[in-house]
């Protein structure tokens, strides 16, 4: 958590937990203070004229004189927590990630169950996704139907992706596995170029489709969607699938109405096999919401960040209060 004027604070993920041994010293100082106060009280009782003491001393000695010592001990505890190195989760923008947007352009995307049609809605939402994605991410675009084509190799140039989205054209059949394999090849190619570390850049495939794979008909075929999803998992590339449309979609083919219901189950299985997440959207607004969620997941990574600053500032504040109360109450620092 982060508090106003103090900064990040956490009570977990300590990097130097052995510093908590210093609390034994703090406890020893507190015990020493208590013993000194008891000894002081005994000395006063031993040498004082009891009749005179009772007449001039208050019946109940003020406990406020102990406040500076209490605050001093509290500040030492706070400084100890800070020295132990607490951490918290910090989200930072990714700069080396690769995202491949794989879009189904089969004839079923003509369906008008989502206005004006599935393709037009997909284009609008995908362009918004490209605009809002973290600038340092390399975004690529693949269109697939019976075959898959790399329209834009992974790049930080968002205009190239948006221009290509405007030029998507319908085609026959649906080869989902081909689209995934093509995306994996594009990721491997750009990963070799980007480099920049011992590991390849993190990558993600965002697969957008509305229907069942028709080529091949068996998704477990060597070129099928399920086989491609397993390959993606082996390569450490999760697939986020978006099934778009309603169960009531249809297209006109040779003056015949052909039902094209959305196929949620196949895409859900693809996401599961690859280690990714599955989403579904039945409207443009829902689709934009899904893309916004993906943007947050893909555009940032979570790392451990320092959370000791707040404890240091709070400790300094309490220490200052200890000094101030010592001057006001006892006219000197506690001994």
Curated annotation (Swiss-Prot):
Task: Say yes or no: keyword Isomerase present.
Answer: no
Q: Which residues cross the membrane?
A: 18-38, 67-87, 309-329
CDD domains found in the cross-reference section: vWFA (cd00198)
PANTHER family the UniProt entry points to: LEUCINE ZIPPER PROTEIN 4, SPORE GERMINATION PROTEIN
| Record carries keyword Transmembrane helix | yes
A Pfam family that this protein carries is VWA_2
Protein's cellular compartments = Cell membrane
Q: What is this protein called?
A: UPF0353 protein MAP_1207
Its family remark reads: Belongs to the UPF0353 family.
